[in-house]
Regions:
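ATP-binding pocket architecture of kinase catalytic cores
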Residues: 4-123
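Conserved catalytic motifs of the protein kinase core domain
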Residues: 26, 79, 160-162, 180
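Generic detector of well-ordered alpha-helical packing
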Residues: 51, 86, 167-169, 187, ...
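A general structural signal marking secondary-structure boundaries and capping sites
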Residues: 61, 71, 90, 112-117, ...
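Helix-rich C-terminal or lid/interface subdomains of diverse kinases
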Residues: 103, 192, 201-273
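An alpha-helical support segment within catalytic cores of ATP-dependent transferases
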Residues: 110-167, 263-273
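Active-site Asp-x-Gly
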Residues: 162-165, 175-219
Length: 273
């Protein structure tokens, strides 16, 4: 058996396994171990929840991992652990054709959001991630925008139709093969919420890595595919829900993130941005 670490996995250790079979051939899988004590303490059911999510999405027409086994409490492995199928492809942050890449990045979302909402208990309801501090980042040129956004973040959520959402949808969780999406990974945060949340999470990552123009192109494609309008409230929920991590990210396009937040605040009619 061989194992190699996979990139990502902020809340867990993730390895690709290759196991030689007795009759010849190799079985490939992904092992995710929730090894961070603070993660398990906060979410003791995280492995069982992810297993439940993978079972739920298995019949859906999306390239999701297939659950092989789960050790929910770590009784056998020492830590909450999942074994799942290894999907083909690689993450691609450097597309040769941005327009095609954005369209194909958006195409799985209508399928996901059309999935029938399951009975209570299968998926949790969306909520904004709490932060250690809600102060504007030190690099902000418009701290008043962040303060207004924080007020919206803590306010009552708007009434809106809810769907199944990935909750962590962005290019780092999308695999590509021969120029097409071959896998959607990292499902433990899947929830019931506004479809705009998935769009906003992807937008935030596009903002940080590229710029606002790329994020807006992605949003326009999603709106064209679905006939829906993006709710800027979701930008606020996602960006403020990432605030702790945005403070010191050296790769962040700070101007684009702040401009997107300012536009969201202005579009919701909360003062002048």
């Amino acid at each position: 058996m061989s194992a190699r670490p996979l990139r990502g996995g902020l809340s867990s250790a993730v390895h690709a396994l290759a196991v030689a079979l007795p009759g010849g051939g190799v079985e490939r899988a992904v092992l995710r171990r929730y090894v961070r004590p603070e993660v398990v303490a906060e979410e003791p059911d995280i492995a069982e929840r992810e297993a439940r999510i993978l079972r739920f999405f298995e019949p859906v027409d999306l390239p999701t991992p297939r659950l092989v086994a789960v050790d929910p409490a770590g009784a056998e492995t020492g830590t909450p652990t999942l074994l799942m199928s290894l999907l083909p492809g690689r993450v691609d942050w450097s597309p040769s054709d941005m327009g095609i890449w954005l369209r194909r990045l958006a195409e799985p979302l209508p399928v996901l959001h059309a999935t029938a909402v399951p009975h209570a208990g299968t998926l949790p309801s969306f909520y904004g991630y709490a932060q250690n501090s809600y102060d504007p980042p030190s690099w902000s040129l418009r701290p008043e925008v962040w303060s207004r956004a924080v007020e919206i973040f803590h306010a009552r959520h708007p009434e809106e139709s809810v769907v199944c959402i990935h909750r962590d949808y962005h290019p780092g969780n999308v695999l590509w093969r021969a120029g097409r999406v071959s896998g959607l990974v990292d499902w433990p945060s899947a929830s019931i919420g506004s479809p705009s949340v998935d769009v906003a999470h992807c937008r935030a990552n596009l903002l940080g890595r590229f710029d606002l123009e790329v994020a807006e192109r992605f949003t326009a494609i999603w709106e064209e595919l679905t006939g829906n309008r993006f709710n800027p409230w979701a930008d606020i929920m996602i960006i403020i829900g990432m605030l702790d991590g945005l403070r010191d990210d050296p790769q962040l396009n700070r101007a684009s993130v702040e401009e997107a937040l300012a536009r969201a605040v202005a579009s919701l009619g909360v003062g002048r941005a």
